[in-house]
């Protein structure tokens, strides 16, 4: 059953088109299995019967899909009570690790200035088999404005006051809105690492086209440039090409492991 706003400190938004009902149920089950009570908002096409059934079964509120992922997440947060202390979103195939919310809420409670708590993320294939663990640790925030984004989004938790202070997600981004958010939040307060795996990200071999990857990298570079001082922006050419190459290599390696696992 859902927690009431007075009971729940955590709001989690799940955005879905309803095309992967079996994964959506796993996502919702991983949230409901947490020790820390949370309320769930699903943003999806309202006519989708599988989404309606899942919302009823897992006690989630249902809101209409506004047409883009960042807009869906902003809607889920904006249309919810302001009493929640912490907020995040999950895609319809992400999973929270058992104890995830206990770790991240404890980290934010212990660090009142912190805006985000995050941990490591397990990459899994469509069958749930482990491909990779992304574990950058406490130095990930230090390279955020020039290096790769190594803070896994699915298991992180954002302090709601900080989310509202920076205005939520920038809907001009199609892919890099999470990086843009983290860069803004880092200016408000620290991003703290809990030191454990807190989520799983499901890797689909066909989830991003070559064009999507190029757009993602271009958006990431735009977000980073926006976060830098005018002087620092003049030197982005020093690191953008190496980071671009490293990003392509990492994606190819995960893709290779996914194909090997499936084969």
PLM segments and residue spans:
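Conserved donor NDP-sugar-binding/catalytic core segment of glycosyltransferases
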Residues: 95, 99-131
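A short, conserved alpha-helix in the catalytic core of glycosyltransferases
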Residues: 162-167, 172-203
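Short aromatic/hydrophobic "clamp" motif used to bind/position activated sugar donors
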Residues: 87
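A recurrent flexible, glycine/aromatic-enriched loop bordering the glycosyltransferase active site
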Residues: 128-129, 138-158
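Glycine-rich, basic loop-to-helix element that forms the pyrophosphate-binding segment
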Residues: 64-82
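Catalytic core of nucleotide-sugar-dependent glycosyltransferases
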Residues: 141-145, 201-204, 210-235
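Short, acidic, metal-binding catalytic loop of nucleotide-sugar glycosyltransferases
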Residues: 26-38
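A conserved acidic beta->alpha catalytic loop
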Residues: 44-52, 91
């Amino acid at each position: 059953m859902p927690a009431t706003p007075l009971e729940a400190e955590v709001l989690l938004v799940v955005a879905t088109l309803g095309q992967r009902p079996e994964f959506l149920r796993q996502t919702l089950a991983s949230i409901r299995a947490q020790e820390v009570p949370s309320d769930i908002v699903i943003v999806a096409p309202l006519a989708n019967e599988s989404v309606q059934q899942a919302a009823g079964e897992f006690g989630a509120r249902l809101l209409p899909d506004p047409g883009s992922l960042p807009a869906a997440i902003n809607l889920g947060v904006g249309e919810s009570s302001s009493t929640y202390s912490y907020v995040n979103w999950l895609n319809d195939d992400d999973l929270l690790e058992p104890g995830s919310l206990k770790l991240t809420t404890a980290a934010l409670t212990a660090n009142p200035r912190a805006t985000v708590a995050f941990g490591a993320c397990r990459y899994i294939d469509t069958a749930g088999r482990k491909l990779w663990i992304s574990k950058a640790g406490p130095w990930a925030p230090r390279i955020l404005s020039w290096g790769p984004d190594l803070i896994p989004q699915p298991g992180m938790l954002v302090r709601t006051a900080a989310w509202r202070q920076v205005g939520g997600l920038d809907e001009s981004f199609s892919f890099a809105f999470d990086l843009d958010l983290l860069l803004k939040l880092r200016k408000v307060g620290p991003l703290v690492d809990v030191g454990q795996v807190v989520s799983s990200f499901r890797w689909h071999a066909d989830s991003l086209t070559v064009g999507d990857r190029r757009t993602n990298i271009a958006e990431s570079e735009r977000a980073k440039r926006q976060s830098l001082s005018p002087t620092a922006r003049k030197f982005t050419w020093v690191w953008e090409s190496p980071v671009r190459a490293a990003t392509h290599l990492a994606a190819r390696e995960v893709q290779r492991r996914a194909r090997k696992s499936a084969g």
